[in-house]
């Protein structure tokens, strides 16, 4: 019997919480324009309790997790009783096209996650492992673009009675078929031109889920005309507020950032983002401390301190709690030098 099967046959595994991840598979990659342009892996996670959900992770997050696990469970860890053979993470690649690199990593990262989730239960219960596979509020707000490696999910629903309340039916999201559509699998909905399809969900930008004549399935948006769309959803875009100071004027600009509000960026990524947005290279990044004085950001540690100090402060919805104050690199008059 394989090690993973032995572990799952033991009572320790049965006593794990239902929300512990037991399998994970990469469904797609997507480009994100966060503090810097990058690709994320869209990962379908399955839990012991049978739940499924999607999470979005960068390679650097895999690397950070592996580093922590090596400290705790590697051959040189202080807790030798908990040491185990950790899976190998594919190495960093420093040169190449980002999308091609991400695509090439998928098989190795899938194998990495499979091996990781087959380790002893104390690894599965490790705080950083659980956080890595946990669906954060940011993850849950994302709308997957394609999920090329998974079929779009569907669900069973009760059929809508033709004798049902006609007012309720007319208020429901619905679409009219423009063309005949015959699905390639039982997951896909068949309909004829002119059919009115009641909409259940938006799978992604190209596919919808709906029901017609008691059947439920997915279908391409291009085959229908929307008669009544879904209610408008809250825009999931987060914004970084920047105060830009020139010699005689200052301006405020909010930059759209596809990152979790709780994330901590790297200084080089913030510099790249602001230089691109303000079309200036000779700038310095700052934040205001508790006394209201400007403090220049010189390292990743400074950025982490800025983020920590902003936690708990009141902030607007979709706006990072910390703000950037952008000054000219050689202008030191903006700093308070009084003791």
Swiss-Prot record:
Impact upon substituting residue 105 to Q: In CGD3; the protein remains cytosolic, does not localize to phagosomes or endosomes and is unable to bind phosphatidylinositol 3-phosphate (PtdIns(3)P) in a lipid-binding assay; unable to rescue the NADPH-oxidase defect of NCF4 functionally null cells
Record-listed a 1,2-diacyl-sn-glycero-3-phospho-(1D-myo-inositol-3-phosphate) binding positions: 58-60, 92-94
Record-annotated PX domain positions: 19-140
PB1 domain ranges (all copies): 237-329
Phenotype upon changing residue 211 to A: No effect on phosphorylation
Signal peptide location: none
Organs and tissues of expression: Expression is restricted to hematopoietic cells.
SUPFAM superfamilies: CAD & PB1 domains (SSF54277), PX domain (SSF64268), SH3-domain (SSF50044)
GO molecular function list: phosphatidylinositol-3-phosphate binding; superoxide-generating NADPH oxidase activator activity
Outcome, altering residue 251 to A: No effect on phosphorylation
Phosphothreonine PTM positions: 154
InterPro entries: NADPH_Oxidase/PX-Domain (IPR051228), p40phox (IPR000919), p40phox_SH3 (IPR035541), PB1-like (IPR053793), PB1_dom (IPR000270), PB1_P40 (IPR034853), PX_dom (IPR001683), PX_dom_sf (IPR036871)
Main location: cytoplasm
GO annotation, cellular component aspect: cytoplasm; cytosol; endosome membrane; membrane; NADPH oxidase complex; phagolysosome; plasma membrane
Membrane topology field: Peripheral membrane protein
PTM-bearing positions, type Phosphoserine: 315
Recorded domain comment: The PB1 domain mediates the association with NCF2/p67-PHOX.
Subunit structure of this chain's protein: Component of the phagocyte NADPH oxidase complex composed of an obligatory core heterodimer formed by the membrane proteins CYBA and CYBB and the cytosolic regulatory subunits NCF1/p47-phox, NCF2/p67-phox, NCF4/p40-phox and the small GTPase RAC1 or RAC2. Part of a cytosolic complex composed at least by NCF1, NCF2 and NCF4. Interacts with NCF2 and NCF1. The NCF2-NCF4 complex interacts with GBP7 (via GB1/RHD3-type G domain).
Protein name as catalogued: Neutrophil cytosol factor 4
Gene responsible for this protein: NCF4
């Amino acid at each position: 019997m394989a090690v993973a099967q032995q572990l799952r046959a033991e009572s320790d595994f049965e006593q794990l919480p239902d929300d512990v991840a037991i399998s994970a598979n990469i469904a797609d990659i997507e480009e994100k324009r966060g503090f810097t342009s990058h690709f994320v892996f869209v990962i379908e996670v399955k839990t012991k309790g049978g739940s499924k959900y999607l999470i979005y992770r960068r390679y650097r997050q895999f690397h950070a997790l592996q580093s922590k696990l090596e400290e705790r469970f590697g051959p040189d860890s202080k807790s030798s009783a908990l040491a185990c053979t950790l899976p190998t993470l594919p190495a960093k690649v420093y040169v190449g096209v980002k999308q091609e690199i991400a695509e090439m990593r998928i098989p190795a990262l899938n194998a990495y996650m499979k091996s990781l989730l087959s380790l002893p239960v104390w690894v599965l219960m490790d705080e950083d492992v659980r956080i890595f596979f946990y669906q954060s509020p940011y993850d849950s707000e994302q709308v997957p673009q394609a999920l090329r490696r998974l079929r779009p999910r569907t669900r069973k629903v009760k059929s809508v009675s033709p004798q049902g309340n006609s007012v309720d039916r007319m208020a429901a999201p619905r679409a009219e078929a423009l063309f005949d559509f015959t699905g390639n699998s039982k997951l896909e909905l068949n309909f004829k031109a002119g059919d009115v399809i009641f909409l259940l969900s938006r799978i992604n930008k190209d596919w919808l889920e709906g029901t017609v004549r008691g059947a439920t399935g997915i279908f391409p948006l291009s085959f229908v005309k929307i008669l009544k769309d879904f209610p408008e959803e809250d825009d999931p875009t987060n914004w970084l507020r920047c105060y830009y100071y020139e010699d005689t004027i200052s301006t405020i600009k909010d930059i759209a950032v596809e990152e979790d509000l709780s994330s901590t960026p790297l200084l080089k990524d913030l510099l790249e983002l602001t230089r691109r947005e303000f079309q200036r290279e000779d700038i310095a990044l700052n934040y205001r401390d508790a006394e209201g004085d400007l403090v220049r950001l010189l390292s990743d540690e400074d950025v982490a301190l800025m983020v920590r100090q902003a936690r708990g402060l009141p902030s607007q919805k979709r706006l990072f709690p910390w703000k950037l104050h952008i000054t000219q690199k050689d202008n030191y008059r903006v700093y308070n030098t009084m003791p």
